[in-house]
């Protein structure tokens, strides 16, 4: 009896018992409820196959997907004061930083790289939304400024991929200072005669929208991205009016002239290369031949 109890029964229980399944093994589409295996989602650039819904894409995955062959030079993360205000809400700010670093394996929300996109050299700056909501603080602001300086030194364009809830409240006025600082960096790039492209991703809101996210020479946006300053619910409560359907989406902004193009994630590298070749004054026919696309598909502002 002991042999059955101590050996056979545990074996049967282990074979038939419920197995632990990682929580992130299957990912649910927020639009249709479709369940997608995480590896399939990663291979499809974090786009739901059936619905076409664009999920949030990790910063490093975006850089690897963007640059030719996934090869790029990672720009160093500048060091700044960690918690000068000694801020605490329901949790210490230092604890939030520690948890976000463990979750994302990043020092802060900004990841920047230098590489080639279909032969065009550029600096790309990407927000990691999973790091405290992609919020803009001192470290992020300094990283963005260094990226603009790198682009100027390399005499190449800069492409920004914002995904943020806005300024980081745990840093107070020190966070808000990054709005004018990054705006100055944008102006320096433009004074150098170099293009600045913004690819608006979901979500782009708050102070990030009020600064460098809306200062591009060309604004692209991913489908269905939420783009705005204040949230839709806050605006409705303030105005006491119901807002139009699709308000603050990339498609709505395209219709009202705030966005130049809505581009699917799979088409972004080719579109960026085509736009940049034109802005860098490369012959139009050469740009058309290399991209294999019709330059006439660009908006009038981009062709001017």
Curated annotation (Swiss-Prot):
One BP term from GO: fatty acid biosynthetic process
Pfam families per record: Carboxyl_trans
Catalytic reaction annotation: N(6)-carboxybiotinyl-L-lysyl-[protein] + acetyl-CoA = N(6)-biotinyl-L-lysyl-[protein] + malonyl-CoA
Top EC category: transferase
UniProt keyword Nucleotide-binding present: yes
Location relative to the cell: Cytoplasm
GO CC terms: acetate CoA-transferase complex
Subunit annotation: Acetyl-CoA carboxylase is a heterohexamer composed of biotin carboxyl carrier protein (AccB), biotin carboxylase (AccC) and two subunits each of ACCase subunit alpha (AccA) and ACCase subunit beta (AccD).
Family note: Belongs to the AccD/PCCB family.
Protein name according to UniProt: Acetyl-coenzyme A carboxylase carboxyl transferase subunit beta
Source organism: Sinorhizobium fredii (strain NBRC 101917 / NGR234)
């Amino acid at each position: 009896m002991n042999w059955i109890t101590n050996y056979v029964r545990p074996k049967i229980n282990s074979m038939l018992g419920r197995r632990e399944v990682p929580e992130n093994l299957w990912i649910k589409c927020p639009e249709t409820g479709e369940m997608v295996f995480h590896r399939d989602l990663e291979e499809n650039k974090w786009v739901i196959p059936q619905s076409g819904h664009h999920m949030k894409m990790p910063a490093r995955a975006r850089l690897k997907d963007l640059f030719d062959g996934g090869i790029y030079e990672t720009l160093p993360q500048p060091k700044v004061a960690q918690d000068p205000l000694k801020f605490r809400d329901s949790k210490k700010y230092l604890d939030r930083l520690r948890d976000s670093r463990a979750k994302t394996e990043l020092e802060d929300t900004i990841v920047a790289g230098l590489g080639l996109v279909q032969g065009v050299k550029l600096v790309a700056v990407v927000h990691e939304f999973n790091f405290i909501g992609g919020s803009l603080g001192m470290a992020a602001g300094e990283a963005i400024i260094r990226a603009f300086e790198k682009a100027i030194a390399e005499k190449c364009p800069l492409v920004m991929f914002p995904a943020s809830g806005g300024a980081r409240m745990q840093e107070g006025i020190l966070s808000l200072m990054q709005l004018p600082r990054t705006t100055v960096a944008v102006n320096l790039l433009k004074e150098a005669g170099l293009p600045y492209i913004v690819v608006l991703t979901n979500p782009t809101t708050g102070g990030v929208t009020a600064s460098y996210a809306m200062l591009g020479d060309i604004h692209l946006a991913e489908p269905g991205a939420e783009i705005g300053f204040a949230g839709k619910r806050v605006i409705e409560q303030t105005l006491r009016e119901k807002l139009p359907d699709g308000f603050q989406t990339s498609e709505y902004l395209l219709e009202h002239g705030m966005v130049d193009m809505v581009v699917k994630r799979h088409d972004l590298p080719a579109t960026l290369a085509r736009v940049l070749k034109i802005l860098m004054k490369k012959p139009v026919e050469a740009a058309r031949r290399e991209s294999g696309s019709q330059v006439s598909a660009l908006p009038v502002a981009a062709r001017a």
